[in-house]
A protein has these predicted regions:
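Extracytoplasmic
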Residues: 277-488
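Zinc-dependent metallopeptidase catalytic helix centered on the HExxH motif
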Residues: 1-82
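Solvent-exposed strand-loop boundary residues in beta-sheet-rich modules
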Residues: 212-216, 253-255, 430-432, 485-487
Length: 488
């Protein structure tokens, strides 16, 4: 529609056209506009497998949307998106991945503009662009001038989206939910509040989706888009007639990469507070509390893996007989990406898991139990000598009674319960000393698990985890060092 009437030229022209085409498609049809034959050039089995899984699990009812998500929302695409600006992206270098980066970013930027401006202002912007440049080309500066002429501020929404490869990153406080006094008509009022911080130097947009209602009638709603300036926080308030059942942070294009499910507390419906209600967002000075803890996550530079198998490079061995046995796993920040449809992970791989530890992304490393020839290490520097308490993080779902053999199935399908774990082989290495640590994964709790207190010198220290384990899989998510004088 728009592309056949006017087109960008000059620096960033391809990216501008991508964004405007996506914006036009979303405005007119509420659907994405991008399609490329490169989407089917490889990994067709994986694409169709994930599409079937998406539809079966209710994540979407659109085959095209699922295919686009599978192709563009891959670790290697994100890595390239973070490594170069859209203006500097050269499609002739690896066309398939370049087009995927353009699709990933342009769709997100288009949604930011549409949701941030609203349909009326977005339509006015596109209409003015076509009317002024029909049959001619325009430059990026012309687009921004048209926006300024119509009192439309693009910079606070998307920053320098053409030249800057940096993204916002969102942190969220704990969620507070209370029942307020009923309104003047006797209707119940429930208030949910939380703080959101953009801890990066690029502005960003978020919204929250939430579920409320009765057991017989669940209702999904969403907040309006909320602007969060760079290195700033806002407080968000939601009002409903019932307590929330679910609450999700939905960033657009951010270092979080995925939607984040938030923990919703239980509400005491008998206690009713007479206090001011907040609906929407307002500036906040909230920041995560600083502690003396030293945490090493699987995405940190202090995490590494090694193999004792002769000549083996980092790779994933997909189960024999799997329909994906000919697929090449994508790489996720140095480790093969793991998906439950692959089967078992014979080498350390990285899995996205909503309850795992992480600042922006929530992931863990995992490997199938084996002969002790695969190792993961969490390394850091202790700032001073003394007694330190060590904890090991595991994100575990509640146990459900399983039939014989279902534990192994759970390990392969991504259901993380203590039943798939076993006795870990761990070694604490410091100042040339090697100390074995006992840890029974079957007895582990979800969250931080205490591994003991140790008298240690200042300097480098490493906790090494082996794949020799009595369970089905080994999980390496995060460790925490805490000075013992601060207690547990």
């Amino acid at each position: 529609f728009l592309h056949f009437q006017t087109s960008a030229m000059g620096e960033g022209a391809l990216a501008i056209n991508f964004v405007l085409d996506e914006l036009t498609a979303l405005l007119l049809t509420d659907k994405r506009g991008f399609f490329s034959a490169h989407e089917f050039s490889s990994s067709i089995n994986l694409i169709m497998g994930e599409t079937i899984q998406d539809i079966a699990q209710g994540r979407t009812d659109s085959v095209a949307e699922s295919i686009q998500r599978t192709i563009t929302n891959r670790p290697s695409v994100w890595d390239r998106a973070l490594g170069a600006s859209l203006a500097a992206l050269e499609p002739n270098d690896d066309p398939r991945r370049s087009l995927s980066v353009l699709a990933l970013k342009s769709e997100a930027i288009a949604r930011v503009i549409l949701d941030g401006l609203g349909r009326e202002k977005t339509g006015a912007l596109l209409s003015a662009l076509v009317n002024q440049y029909r049959g001619r080309h325009f430059h990026a500066a012309d687009l921004y001038q048209i926006a300024a002429d119509h009192d439309i501020e693009l910079e606070p929404l998307v920053g320098d989206w053409l030249h800057d490869s940096s993204l916002p990153g969102f942190l969220v406080s704990s969620v507070e939910s209370v029942r307020l006094t009923d309104d003047s008509q006797g209707n119940p009022r429930y208030q949910t509040r939380l703080h959101v911080r953009n801890d990066e130097s690029t502005p960003g947009l978020v919204r929250f989706s939430f579920q409320w209602g009765s057991k017989k009638k669940r209702i999904w709603d969403a907040t309006e888009p909320i602007r969060v300036p760079a290195n700033s926080s806002v407080e968000v308030g939601i009002s409903t007639l019932t307590p929330l059942g679910e609450l999700w942070l939905k960033p657009y294009l951010s270092l979080n990469r995925h939607d984040v499910k938030l923990r919703v507390p239980k509400v005491d419906s008998e206690a009713r507070l007479n206090t001011e209600i907040l609906v929407g967002a307002r500036p906040s000075d909230w920041k995560p509390r600083k502690t003396a803890d030293i945490v090493v996550d699987d995405l940190d530079s202090g995490f590494s893996v090694r193999s004792e198998r002769e000549g083996e490079a980092i790779s994933i061995e997909i189960s024999i007989g799997s329909p994906f046995s000919d697929e090449v796993a994508d790489m996720d920040q140095g480790l093969p990406e793991y998906k439950s449809i692959y089967g078992t992970a014979e080498a350390w791989s990285r899995s996205v898991y909503e309850d795992s530890w992480g600042k922006y992304r929530h992931t863990h490393a995992l490997v199938t139990s084996g002969a002790g020839d695969q190792h993961a290490a969490f390394s850091t520097e202790l700032p001073h000598e003394g007694r330190w308490r060590l904890s090991y993080y595991l994100a575990l779902s509640p146990e459900q009674k399983a039939k014989k053999g279902e534990e192994a199935e759970g390990a392969a399908t991504g259901r993380l319960t203590a039943s798939v774990l076993g006795e870990y082989q761990m070694n604490l290495i410091s100042n040339g000393d090697n100390q074995k640590i006992e840890f029974d994964g079957k007895a582990a709790a979800s969250g931080w698990n205490d591994l003991g207190e140790f008298q240690l010198p200042a300097g480098e220290i490493s906790l090494e985890v082996s794949n020799a384990n009595t369970g089905f899989i080994v999980i390496a998510d995060a460790i925490r060092w805490r000075p013992s004088t601060l207690g547990k």
